[in-house]
């Protein structure tokens, strides 16, 4: 059985002698590491998955598959010869390139869009086969929005206009484009997406998808960060192995390591809310009119916006904490954050909340985190 061309590319490389194990990690495997984290995070019963799926009017299983497929392509730009030549590896073969890698002008996230553009204009990808009944312009707009959150996994959107893509072609090389095409085909076989359930021709739907992409973008950054932990996702080179490398064989391993990585973060450890009684019981004083309102206002499972405003000293913070406690206890939220204008006000609020949040959450599953960021 012949080795796929995309296994001749590295995605992570050893940076110091302190790093134990192999000198590099195959690009295809790193992509699956990150996709595995996303797959496990966006579980179909996860509140975020359910909320975004509801916004897009699609099944949670489809959202999960779409996110996993897209994350698996997040480092498509690393197929560029200029990137590969940052660390030439003899056993992976030469990667001729016209220019050297330039992290300012042509970082690998930008190169991802450049490769995607070349795959389309050179006919490696035929999106009309995925969307036979949709306008090509709508298809293009959808994929630009889709890869906005994937290629921008370093936290900043990247340019994806045709002019920029053409200018970046010199950093890529023909072999990298061919390998990327083969990789996309095999990834799609692993994570097939029912494109027909996506209403990409509906501008209202596309607007909602772009709104949802903000959530997915933040999640993509998190997944890439966690999936790059070489203490958990050990580097694999496949050198000396009898069997050729395989995405399908590696995938169960990647999912298992993703579970290990997620467990170490404690981010998804379920929290249990203590029952809310009253302002008097929580804070030890009789409620102001605003606080009384916060105790009694109707709360619902659907999204609600509460605006609490009153004179200085009316106890707005306590009212907000009481209302938040009620929402969490009812199962309508599982956490909260405060946004404040300055570091000084944030520091002060952190101290106040630190004294109280233990009355909102139970410690039965371990301590609940409170972070000043």
Language model: regions and residue ranges:
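A short acidic (Asp/Glu
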Residues: 161-162, 321, 347-352
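Walker A/P-loop
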Residues: 301-325
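Conserved Walker A/P-loop ATP-binding site and its immediately adjacent core
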Residues: 334-357, 370-373
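Conserved RecA-like helicase motor-core motifs
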Residues: 49, 359-373
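Accessory nucleic-acid engagement/destabilization modules that flank
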Residues: 2-271
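Post-Walker A helix-loop "phosphate-sensing" segment adjacent to the P-loop in P-loop NTPases
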Residues: 326-334, 356-362
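Conserved pre-motif I regulatory segment
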Residues: 30, 271-309
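Residue-level preference for the first positions of well-ordered beta-strands
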Residues: 66, 305-307, 335-337
């Amino acid at each position: 059985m012949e080795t796929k061309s995309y296994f001749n590319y590295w995605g992570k490389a050893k940076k110091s002698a302190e790093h134990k194990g192999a000198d590099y990690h195959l690009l295809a495997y790193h992509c699956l590491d990150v996709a595995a984290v996303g797959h496990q995070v966006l579980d179909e019963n996860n509140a975020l998955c359910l909320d975004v799926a509801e916004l897009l009017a699609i099944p949670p299983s489809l959202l999960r598959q779409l996110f996993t497929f897209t994350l698996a392509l997040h480092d498509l730009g690393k197929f560029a010869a200029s990137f590969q030549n940052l660390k030439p590896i003899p056993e992976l073969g030469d990667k001729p390139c016209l220019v050297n890698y330039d992290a300012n002008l042509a970082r690998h996230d930008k190169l991802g869009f450049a490769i995607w553009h070349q795959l389309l204009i050179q006919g490696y990808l035929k999106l009309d086969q995925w969307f036979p009944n949709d306008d090509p312009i709508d298809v293009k707009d959808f994929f630009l929005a889709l890869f906005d959150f994937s290629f921008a996994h370093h936290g900043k959107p990247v340019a994806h206009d045709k002019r920029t893509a053409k200018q970046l072609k010199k950093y890529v090389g023909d072999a990298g484009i061919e390998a990327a095409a083969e990789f996309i085909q095999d990834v799609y076989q692993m994570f097939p997406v029912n494109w027909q359930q996506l209403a990409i021709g509906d501008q209202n739907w596309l607007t909602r998808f772009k709104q949802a992409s903000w959530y997915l973008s933040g999640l993509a950054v998190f997944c890439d960060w966690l999936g790059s932990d070489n203490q958990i996702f050990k580097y694999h080179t496949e050198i000396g192995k009898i069997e050729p490398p395989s995405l399908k064989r590696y995938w169960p391993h990647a999912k298992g390591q993703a579970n290990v990585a997620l467990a170490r973060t404690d981010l998804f450890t379920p929290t249990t809310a203590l029952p809310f009684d009253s302002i008097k019981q929580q804070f030890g004083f009789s409620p102001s009119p605003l606080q009384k309102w916060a105790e009694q206002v109707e709360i619902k499972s659907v999204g609600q916006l509460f605006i609490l405003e009153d004179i200085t000293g009316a106890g707005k913070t306590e009212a907000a904490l009481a209302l938040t406690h009620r929402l969490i206890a009812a199962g309508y939220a599982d956490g909260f954050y405060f946004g404040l204008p300055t570091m000084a006000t944030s520091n002060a609020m952190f101290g106040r909340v630190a004294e109280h949040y233990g009355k909102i959450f139970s410690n039965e599953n371990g301590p609940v985190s409170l972070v000043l960021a």
